[in-house]
Amino acid sequence: MKKYISILIIVLVSCESSSDLGLSGGRGETSFSAGGDSNTGIGGSMARFTIVDDYLYTIDSWTLKSYDISDQQNPLYKEDVNLGWGIETIFPYNGNLFIGAQSGMHIYNLDNKESPEWVSTYEHMTSCDPVVVQGDYAFVTLRGGTECQGFNNQLDIIDISDLVRPELFKTYSMINPHGLGVDDNCLFITEGEYGLKMFDISNLENIELIKHFEDISSIDVIPFNDILMVIGSDGFHQYNYDCELGEIEYISTIPINSL
């Protein structure tokens, strides 16, 4: 699993940089968390691939592909699943895949890991939409403009207690939201050049902005075990974080040059 984590971090940063800098390529479970599965790959909310147990799942603009990686020296391609248009992100949680598209969020179950099966789709206005999941709720940021089309810049909280019938729970306005990460009652949202936001989500009816770090340009974020991993246009940054105090403390940076 440590090997998987290292690979995921490197490729995630590469994908994030290429996408948001206008280069070819794709874009990058909540937090640096295992998304509720014991052997789940770790990545950001804008990831285009993930690992669940012995299977690797990748997406392109139209398709979900599955691979058996139980033999790491000989991975086996298994199946294509047609997802429709505008597919952007993939996030695993509790035996399901949550797939962000420009038109909505698709839910697929992994009862048959070789061939994920469609459960439902939550539709929204056309925009970019990374997704993370915790408990009975999915957190989705919608961003308008540029390649994302649309005009909405917001956080949608979606009730997924019934996976077959996901429903909008609450919407909050944002500036220019990109990726996001959740850790218990703490939600981080990256606002691109407008900084990084930390929210208290203990009351989803009225989430509270704890702090806005306006000087931290951010594209995606991964909170894990009190370490906050922030992907920016210039590299991969690590911070300690304390949600109760509303503080983060700089640790280190891995610089990433634009390709």
Name every feature range the model reports, one short phrase each.
Residues 15-259:
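Feature marking well-ordered beta-strand scaffolds used for ligand recognition
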Residues 4-12:
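Sec-dependent N-terminal signal peptides
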